[in-house]
Structures are given as structure tokens and as C-alpha cells.
Amino acid sequence: MNRFSLVAATLALSLFCTPNVVSATNSLPQTPSEWMDFLEKQSINQEDYGNSDQNFVTDSLPLVKDSAQKPDPNVIKIMIDPGHANYYNPSTVVNGYYESVMTWTLSNYLKEELEALGVQADLTKISLEDDPDLQPRGHMSAGYDFFLSVHSNATSYSSIDYPVAICYQNLDWTDIDDTSRAVGQLLTDKVTEVMETRQKGIIWQRLSDNDRDGNGVNDDEWYGVLCGARYVGTPGVLMEHSFHTNYRATVWLMQDSNLRKLAKEEANVLYTYFRTQKESNRYIGDVDGDGSLSVQDAVQILTYYAQQAAGCSPTFASDLQYTTADYDGDDSITVNDAVSVLETYAKQAAGLQPTLLMVGDRAHS
């Protein structure tokens, strides 16, 4: 056995001997998170993100704290970024696998599954060949609830197969980092479950070496797409769907039925999380989603009722908006719902404090 083979064998064996801490006498990585750090420092991670730590292109944008667009209160909006373009990042263990093809396929399936749930899902590119720059991909998520960049990972060690959700840095001036980590954990747990990887998935962060936005604080994202999304105030994750340098994972990702299954499960994760978030922050009767009950809300209810009575087929922007309009919870929109909204509005205008019910309270009562 030559020296390289001996080292590779030793590293492969150590991956599955994972004590909670690294002993002083053993400098090899022991956990998936330590392995990610090790691979990056040794420059043997074969994934290419397009020289992400250079060419920051948001100079013309104002700072996110001053310009972030608020998501639509009525509609869940997800921006999906299919990683790379053309026939890029081939597997070194299975002929015919290209990361760019997998990400394009999975992203389109995910878009379909989200739309079936009533979510507005959009892509950062229009074809397999389309290859927008990295930060502008993130910028496209302005006003969306979430940005998801779809990838598979690569390394020189073929035994590694854990999924990785790359999340935002810990930030004390916003809560989008909390959303990034929360959704990242849900996604990596789901990908681990669906792909049945041998190693449990992790959430991970990579800090830029530079002050990319020029605010004097070294707290920026290394990954260009995440840097761009964070800059416009959108929580996001770069999701590595295991490693295409692992034989079993690569074969799994080449099966169309598996990608469809994965898309369905990830769509359910995203829909459930953001539907719950919107419900927990929405009053019943607040049809327009502006945070209060008003005459305008009652007018929207009456307009819907009148169109329905005239034999038309009125619609709201989402089922969440319909739920807020159904004030009495009888699964229909009537004049009574509008009257209840007006009564609540009148009490508030008179300085009283009527009881307001959140959509989430009704959903879980």
C-alpha cells in the first residue's frame, strides 16, 4: 500500500469513529462540522463557487437595514437558485452525473411542488445554460420569504455523504439569521432522512475573509449567493444534497424518482414553516395583511361576497387570505364576516380593546 492509500484509508476509518471531542493526540477531524472546516482549510474540497470572495457587486445597493423589502403577508414566496450551469461539476465516481444538471432538475421539481401548495416559487435562471453571477442570484430574492440555493457537494474523500445546510453568520441586528438556521436545520434533517445518508446532516457557516459590504464589520458571507441574498434582507440557505463524490449518494441523485421525492419533501418543509410563520403573525379579519382591522378589510370581504352572489368565481391571493376573511370560521365568506370586522374596528376607534384572534390560534385550537 502506497503512502497516499494508507493516509486515505486512515482518514476513511476515522470518519466513522466519532467521539464528541477531538483528543489532543489525534489531529484528524472527528465530526462532520470539523470535516467541513478541515476540507476548506486544506483546499481539497472540489466544489467550485466561482471565486465567491471577490468581485462584490452590490456597490449600487443601499444597506439592507435601510432598504429590505418586506415579504408579501398573503403569499409565501420562495426564490430557488439552481447551482451552476451547463454540464458542470461531474462526479468522479459515477459517469454521467453533473451537479448542474441535478440542481436544475431538482429545482424545477421543487418549484412545481411548491406551486401545487399555493406558494409563489421562482428560479434565478431560465435554462440549464443560463449562468447569472453569484451575488445577483441572491439579489433576485428581494421581497421573498426565503432564498434556497440547490447544490451537491464534492471532496477527495469518497466515504463522506452528509448533507450540509450552509447558513448565515450569527447577527445581532436582524432575525434573518435565525430563520436561516431554523430552516437550514429542517432541510438538512429532511434530506438526511429521505436520502438515508450514513452520516447525519449538519448546518454550517463560512465567514468571508473580507469586509464585503464595507460597513466596517467582518461579518459577511463567503458564499456569493448567500452574500447577495442577505444584502437584500432575505433569509437563505445553500443546501448541499450530500456529496457527488460518494458513490451511493451520486447514484441516488441520478434517479429521477428520487429527485421528485426529495422535491416534494423539501417543499412541504418550506411550506409548513412559512405558513406557520405567517399564521402566527396575522389577525383574523386582517384581509390585506397590514397588521390591523379596518374598513378596507371589510370592503374586500363584501366585494368577494358580492361577486360570489353574482355567480362569479372570486379568489383571494392565497388560502391564508381566505382564512383571515372568514372571520366567524364557518368556512364561507358572508356579510356577517364584514360586519364583525367593522364592529371590531369601531371598538378600536372608540378606544376599547376588543379581543383579536390570530390565524395560528384558530388553526391549532
Predicted stretch roles:
Residues 180-221:
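Active-site-adjacent substrate-binding region
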Residues 104-107, 111, 138, 144, ...:
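Extracytoplasmic/secreted envelope proteins and their assembly/folding machinery
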Residues 119-129, 150, 195-207, 277-280, ...:
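Surface-exposed patches in mature extracellular/periplasmic domains of secreted proteins
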Residues 42-183:
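Catalytic-core regions of hydrolytic enzymes
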Residues 22-27, 279-365:
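Cellulosome-associated attachment modules in secreted, modular CAZymes
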Residues 2-25:
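Sec-dependent N-terminal signal peptides of Gram-positive bacterial secreted proteins and lipoproteins
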Residues 79, 88, 149-156, 204-280:
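Active-site-adjacent mobile loop/cap segments within catalytic or ligand-binding domains
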Residues 108-119, 142-146, 152, 188-197, ...:
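Sec-exported extracytoplasmic/periplasmic mature domains
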